[in-house]
């Protein structure tokens, strides 16, 4: 999957929802992480991409940004059963 397609999938995640790295790039979750680490696009909703277990990257404003969009948490993890978005044809949705 090329970078443009990865970015399109991330842009398709609606406010209040999240996708796991593996939802963005099925079978290659690290590819999504690599693209996010290399692209500096101001309007890209990077905070909507989380780990499959709902945990977040450390040291970023991710939790604050997700809460502002109404994403629900269970402790420090996103409630994936409620907040996971479909992201392409192979993504799982609640």
How would you name each of these model-derived features?
Residues 1-94:
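Nucleic acid-binding interface residues in structured DNA/RNA-binding domains
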């Amino acid at each position: 999957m090329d970078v443009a397609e990865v970015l399109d999938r991330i842009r398709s995640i609606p406010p209040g929802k999240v996708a796991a790295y593996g939802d963005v790039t099925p079978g290659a979750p690290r590819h999504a992480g690599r693209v996010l680490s290399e692209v500096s696009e101001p309007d890209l909703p990077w905070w909507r991409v989380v780990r499959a277990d709902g945990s977040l990257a450390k040291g970023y404003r991710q939790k604050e940004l997700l809460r502002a969009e109404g994403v629900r948490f269970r402790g420090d993890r996103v409630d994936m059963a409620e907040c996971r978005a479909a992201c392409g044809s192979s993504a799982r949705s609640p």
